[in-house]
């Protein structure tokens, strides 16, 4: 590959890195888990919806949830949705 081709490739890779959203790189893996209401009492909680790329409310049972369960939408956004 010529030096011009290498420079073009380097430029394209740099542009791709700049345009990739930071939030998707720093998001914990558990943010990809589905909402898990658990078997106990129903409480209003939040989870990160990986398909819609946003935090949503759901009815949480109060026990045995996965880590993608937050007390507030704001806490979910800080952890999974980025800024």
Curated annotation (Swiss-Prot):
InterPro entries assigned to the protein according to its UniProt record, in alphabetical order: Kunitz_BPTI (IPR002223), Kunitz_BPTI_sf (IPR036880), Prtase_inh_Kunz-CS (IPR020901), TFPI/VKTCI-like (IPR050098)
Domain (BPTI/Kunitz inhibitor) ranges: 31-80
Signal peptide start and end residues: 1-24
Coiled coil segments of this chain: none
GO molecular function: serine-type endopeptidase inhibitor activity
Positions of disulphide bridges: 31-80, 40-63, 55-76
Keyword Secreted listed: yes
CC annotations in GO: extracellular space
Keyword Secreted: yes
Keyword terms, alphabetized: Disulfide bond, Protease inhibitor, Secreted, Serine protease inhibitor, Signal
Subcellular location: Secreted
Pfam families for this protein: Kunitz_BPTI
PANTHER family linked: BPTI_KUNITZ INHIBITOR DOMAIN-CONTAINING PROTEIN (PTHR10083:SF374), KUNITZ-TYPE PROTEASE INHIBITOR-RELATED (PTHR10083)
Function according to Swiss-Prot or TrEMBL: Serine protease inhibitor.
Record-given protein name: Stephenin-3
Source species taxonomy: Eukaryota, Metazoa, Chordata, Craniata, Vertebrata
């Amino acid at each position: 590959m010529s030096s011009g081709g290498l420079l073009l490739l380097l430029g394209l890779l740099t542009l791709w890195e700049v345009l990739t959203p930071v939030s998707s790189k720093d998001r914990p893996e558990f943010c990809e888990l589905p909402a898990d209401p658990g078997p106990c009492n129903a409480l209003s909680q939040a989870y990160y919806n990986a398909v819609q790329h946003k935090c949503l409310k759901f009815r949480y049972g109060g026990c045995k949830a996965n880590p993608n369960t937050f007390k507030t939408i704001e806490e979910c956004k800080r952890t999974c949705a980025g800024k």
